[in-house]
Amino acid sequence: INYLDENNGSFKGAPKFPQFYLFDAMFYFYLKTKNKNYFKPVEILLNNLCSKGIYDQLEGGISRYAVDEKWIIPHFEKMLYDNIQFIDLLTKFYQNTKNDYFKNKLLQTIQYFNNEFKNKEELYGSAYDADSEGVEGKYYVWSYTELKNLLKDDIKYLENNYEISESGNFEGNNILVEKNLIPDGEKNSLDQIKNKLLNIRRKRIKPFFDDKSQTDLNAYMLQVLLKTSVNLDDEDLKSKTIETIEILNKKLHQKIIHCYENKEIETFLEDYVYYALLMITLYEVNADKKALEKSIKIMNDTWELFFNKETRLFQKNIIKDNDLFASPLDLNDSNIPNGNSVYLLISNKLYSITNDKIWSERNEVLKKSFHQVINSYYSQMFSFIKTLDICDNSLSFTFHGSSQSIK
């Protein structure tokens, strides 16, 4: 925590990654304690992500990381997993602040992913490459001459609100970076200009789209969008999300697989638990009893297939009878929150819903095992720390050297 960048957000230095697993946990503890020390780093992060070059100012969504410490120059590669967590945190932040700036970025990003990130199966693909025609960022950047020729006198609106210049900010070209909040009197003119630029950009050759639909990421995305639709009271988003859930259900009707396009890829813990999380969220939103039953079945299957009786935790790969060695224990939050913490969260929900003691018993097993390994993994286990607090409200969380008990 002492390495937080108090000006630009996330951690100090470059390259710079959003580290959503940490800031999601931090915002959870802010909502619980109202301690502004937890709120401020999240606000700084989201302000910077939404206004700088890492955010696609024309279409929405963020790139995987920035090469500089001020988020100006992105690596341009767009990943589904990052943006799921970006949408989730933006939703929570908007719900708390009611700041329309963040709502607009949230809606723009959702629209982008629903329009541009779906494959021919109408599921979400995995990523867009950083380069097109062999040049990194070519699809996204603008020369000053190009902007001047396209916009004529209207370029003044762009110059007033975005950091553009003849020298540019990326290899002689310009990445759109907001200067400040756009005045109400210029919003309409600027929106027209941005739409004009977007229409021109869409005529360019796009970066390569990796259209592989991964079960864990699709389930996670749909679960987040389902929650967002409820929080925003957006029936259209809810309806479209449920339509996509039905497509995913059909694909996984016979067997849970990691990648529909390549069934040879091994299935992982996260494929099971994120699908179970989606199903229980669908039950919470729509009182869909079949979804609840499916969630319970998936959770029981997960216990049978992935639970390691020696470590008393889940391993990433399915345990086979003829395995000579157990897979290494993986408790880190990497691209997405760890499957162990997701299982703990769902079992806590299932115990509240069903009052079946099997879920509280499994919770106790996981919590006990977690406490035995936390000192080795804590810096990468923020989703687990957050989930444990949801389950028992008994953790102590430290910020800038001062310990605050969470009851």
Residues of each region from the PLM?
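Glycan-recognition and catalytic cores of secretory/periplasmic carbohydrate-active enzymes
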Residues: 1-407
